[in-house]
């Protein structure tokens, strides 16, 4: 069946539905540049309320397995590809891409000129889009949504035994972040995004992790006073959305990139190690560099492609905040040492970042 992808810039792209579309869906349209890792992308809560375009021309050739989910379900609004493999050619595959999306009633649009579509997004910027059975566009503006509430846990759960006790504040965390901490011998308590500082104090953590998540960080501005209290009390590692919240809580300014960074091959310069690391990224917002002038933060990580801020460290407090995903999945594990550096501050109670 034919369907139409209408983008807010006024253009329309047609394709064929490989997974059902009952009427229409809308969301912010973004693109992912990795050749692999589609299963992790689909189940990353950070993609909540977004329509994802995969730039690689063939997606789904190794299917969907039971081990590479980043959460219990996919969070994207729709998937757009040039070609979707009808089978998963891997011994661990349980479903094809289309079968998996059909199970969750997420539309899959194929045979789209994704090259032209991505060029339009790069030119016009990230924008709203609508996938519809009608060739007539009715794309609206950006919806006033609060996606973090939809993906954050509603209960407090603890994983692992012994080791340092960390509280992971869940703004939409990826399973791989939890696994990276458990693999290093930590005991991790996952709490809802709006857990009060007093409730976290009662858990007696040795350190704090602020997770990734979807949406505009300013939608969480009501939580900035609580975040400010927490990062003053505990060694802190902040990732992606958590990084932006640390910046906002300490008076920094965030800005939106034209089309964001989404891929498993983003080069980042580490000013401490004096080396370039390949990173996995998924974000539309960055910390504005000028807002760090005269503040007690140093820029440690810089995106090689566009010079944007990819990570900051506090000069006097054990706060390490990164825009990229050190846990990867998908992507290289070049920056896994970030977890080790964070745990050094937890064990020693001192700042070793700078």
From Swiss-Prot:
User: Where do the record's region annotations for CPSase lie?
Assistant: 1-163
Q: Where is the Glutamine amidotransferase type-1 domain?
A: 165-352
Q: How does activity depend on temperature?
A: Thermostable up to 63 degrees Celsius.
Give the family per the record.
Belongs to the CarA family.
Decide whether keyword ATP-binding is in the record. yes
Which protein are we looking at? Carbamoyl phosphate synthase arginine-specific small chain
Q: What class of enzyme is it?
A: ligase
Q: Which PROSITE patterns match?
A: GATASE_TYPE_1
| Record-linked PANTHER family | CARBAMOYL-PHOSPHATE SYNTHASE SMALL CHAIN, MULTIFUNCTIONAL TRYPTOPHAN BIOSYNTHESIS PROTEIN-RELATED
**What InterPro entries would the database entry show?**
Anth_synth/Amidotransfase, CarbamoylP_synth_ssu, CarbamoylP_synth_ssu_N, CarbP_synth_ssu_N_sf, Class_I_gatase-like, CPSase_GATase1, GATASE
Q: What is its EC number?
A: 6.3.5.5
Q: Which UniProt keywords apply?
A: Amino-acid biosynthesis, Arginine biosynthesis, ATP-binding, Glutamine amidotransferase, Ligase, Nucleotide-binding
The family database entries (SMART domains) matched by this protein are listed as: CPSase_sm_chain
Q: Where is the active site?
A: 240, 325, 327
Q: Which reaction does it catalyse?
A: hydrogencarbonate + L-glutamine + 2 ATP + H2O = carbamoyl phosphate + L-glutamate + 2 ADP + phosphate + 2 H(+)
Q: What does this protein do?
A: Small subunit of the glutamine-dependent carbamoyl phosphate synthetase (CPSase). CPSase catalyzes the formation of carbamoyl phosphate from the ammonia moiety of glutamine, carbonate, and phosphate donated by ATP, constituting the first step of the biosynthetic pathway leading to arginine and/or urea. The small subunit (glutamine amidotransferase) binds and cleaves glutamine to supply the large subunit with the substrate ammonia.
Give the metabolic or biological pathway. Amino-acid biosynthesis; L-arginine biosynthesis; carbamoyl phosphate from bicarbonate: step 1/1
Can you state the subunit structure given in the record? Composed of two chains; the small (or glutamine) chain promotes the hydrolysis of glutamine to ammonia, which is used by the large (or ammonia) chain to synthesize carbamoyl phosphate. Tetramer of heterodimers (alpha,beta)4.
Q: Which residues bind L-glutamine?
A: 46, 213, 215, 241, 244, 282, 285
An example of a GO molecular function for this protein is:
ATP binding
Which species?
Geobacillus stearothermophilus
Q: Which GO terms describe its biological process?
A: 'de novo' pyrimidine nucleobase biosynthetic process; 'de novo' UMP biosynthetic process; glutamine metabolic process; L-arginine biosynthetic process
């Amino acid at each position: 069946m034919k369907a139409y992808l209408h983008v807010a810039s006024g253009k329309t792209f047609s394709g064929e539905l490989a997974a059902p579309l009952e009427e229409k869906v809308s969301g912010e349209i973004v693109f992912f540049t990795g050749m692999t890792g589609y299963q992790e992308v689909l189940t990353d809560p950070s993609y909540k309320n977004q329509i994802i375009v995969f730039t690689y021309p063939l997606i789904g050739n190794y299917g969907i397995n039971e081990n590479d989910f980043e959460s219990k379900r996919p969070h994207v609004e729709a998937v757009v590809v040039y070609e979707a493999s009808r089978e998963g050619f891997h011994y661990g595959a349980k479903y094809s891409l289309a079968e998996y999306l059909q199970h969750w009633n997420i539309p899959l649009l194929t045979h789209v000129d994704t090259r032209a579509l991505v060029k339009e997004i790069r030119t016009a910027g990230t924008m709203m889009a609508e996938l519809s059975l009608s060739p007539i566009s009715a794309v609206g503006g950006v919806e006033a949504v609060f996606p973090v509430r939809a993906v954050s846990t509603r209960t407090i759960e603890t994983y692992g035994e012994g080791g340092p006790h960390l509280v992971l504040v869940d703004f939409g965390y990826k399973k791989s972040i939890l696994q990276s901490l458990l693999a290093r011998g930590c005991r991790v308590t996952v709490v809802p995004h709006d857990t009060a500082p007093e409730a976290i104090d009662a858990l007696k953590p040795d350190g704090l992790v602020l997770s990734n998540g979807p949406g505009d960080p300013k939608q969480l501005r009501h939580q900035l006073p609580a975040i400010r209290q927490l990062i003053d009390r505990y060694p802190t590692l902040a990732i992606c959305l958590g990084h932006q919240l640390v910046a906002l809580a300490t008076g920094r300014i965030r800005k939106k990139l034209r089309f964001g960074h989404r891929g498993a091959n983003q080069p980042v310069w580490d000013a401490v190690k004096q080396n370039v690391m390949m990173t996995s990224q998924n974000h539309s917002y960055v910390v504005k560099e000028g807002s760090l002038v005269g503040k007690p933060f140093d820029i440690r990580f810089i995106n090689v492609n566009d010079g944007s801020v990819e990570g900051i460290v506090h000069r006097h407090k054990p706060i390490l905040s990164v825009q990229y995903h050190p846990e990867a999945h998908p992507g290289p594990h070049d920056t896994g040492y970030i977890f080790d550096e964070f745990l050094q501050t937890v064990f020693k109670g001192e700042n070793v970042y700078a």
